[in-house]
């Protein structure tokens, strides 16, 4: 895959339930701390190196932001780093909340 793919929140949740995909949230630390999707990893400039060391390049990666816009750039970045299956979650965390999918709140 030379480019990321789009996935809706239901498709993202289905991949997570299969136990193979990794969900990353690229929102700011305050937003992530208030609420985030269950099992989401907070991907930041400070955590990217550890993330890339811990995750297999073949593992599907789901990238979530606020509304599904900035996740596209982050998803393409991960593809460029060598990740093979990268998805931008359409609608982002807002769509995840609207769909009433599992959320962790502080």
UniProtKB/Swiss-Prot annotation:
Residues 17-105 form the Rhodanese domain. It is an enzyme of class 2 (transferase). It catalyses: thiosulfate + hydrogen cyanide = thiocyanate + sulfite + 2 H(+); thiosulfate + [thioredoxin]-dithiol = [thioredoxin]-disulfide + hydrogen sulfide + sulfite + 2 H(+). Its main location: cytoplasm. One of its GO terms (cellular component) is cytoplasm. It is found in: Cytoplasm. One of its GO terms (biological process) is glycerol metabolic process. Keywords: Cytoplasm, Transferase. Pfam families: Rhodanese (PF00581). Its EC number is 2.8.1.1. The active site is at 65 (cysteine persulfide intermediate). It comes from the Bacteria. GO terms for molecular function: thiosulfate-cyanide sulfurtransferase activity. HAMAP family: Thiosulf_sulfurtr (MF_01009). Transferase that catalyzes the transfer of sulfur from thiosulfate to thiophilic acceptors such as cyanide or dithiols. May function in a CysM-independent thiosulfate assimilation pathway by catalyzing the conversion of thiosulfate to sulfite, which can then be used for L-cysteine biosynthesis. Belongs to the GlpE family. This is Thiosulfate sulfurtransferase GlpE. It comes from Vibrio parahaemolyticus serotype O3:K6 (strain RIMD 2210633). The lineage of its organism: Bacteria, Pseudomonadati, Pseudomonadota, Gammaproteobacteria, Vibrionales. The gene is glpE.
């Amino acid at each position: 895959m030379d480019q990321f793919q789009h996935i809706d929140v239901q498709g993202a949740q289905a991949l997570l339930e299969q136990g193979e995909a990794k969900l990353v949230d690229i929102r700011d630390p305050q937003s992530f701390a208030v609420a985030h999707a269950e099992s989401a990893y907070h991907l930041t400039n400070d955590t990217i190196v550890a993330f890339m060391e811990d995750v297999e390049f073949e593992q599907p990666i789901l990238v979530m932001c606020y509304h599904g816009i900035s996740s596209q750039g982050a998803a393409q970045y991960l593809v460029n780093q060598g990740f093979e299956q990268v998805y931008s979650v359409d609608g982002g965390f807002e769509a995840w909340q609207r769909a009433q999918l599992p959320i962790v709140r502080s």
